[in-house]
Amino acid sequence: ILPMGQVIAIKCNGLAIGKYANMAQLGVPFFNNAKEGLDNAGKKGWEIGRIPLPVFMEHIQLIGTPDISKIDTVPMTIDEFPAIDADFMTIAKWAGRLVRIDNVYFTRQEYDYGKPADLDEADKIFAPSTNGIGYPQSRIFALQSDPKKISAIGTSEYAKFADAPLPASDYVGSITGFISYYWDKGGSS
């Protein structure tokens, strides 16, 4: 939507702030009727929803011109990820931070109830469709020097690259993204 390196200011009037997995989330008020997809009666009520693109564009102001050199990532290793059972302050320190992990590759697996599982051929993309349910898709990556050290990225099916194929496991590179936490009943994070 906007070029990388574009600084923006967001006018929050008319938007709502909530949380997802203890991270602040900016969106629009949305009433979950607990009748669609995998929703359950316990989730019925108001929550934060996605910001439609036209609404997003009305709420931003561009500051200066895009400058990719000003994107500041924190280099990190898999071992440095705070454990999901860490105290709130540790999680709060890292959640939402833009980090880069070098020398990793995709294993072409996902977490299934907290354990690595091979992907079907059709699912070897970043985020297969959830038919509108919208839960993030986990894709496992490993450290080249120690393949037993793994973690995962979560990608929304709404991402521009959602249906792009995962790189072959012999492709080693860097992953840049925001740290977030997700905890399901199966124990994956």
Kindly label every feature range from the protein language model.
Residues 1-189:
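OB-fold nucleic-acid-binding modules
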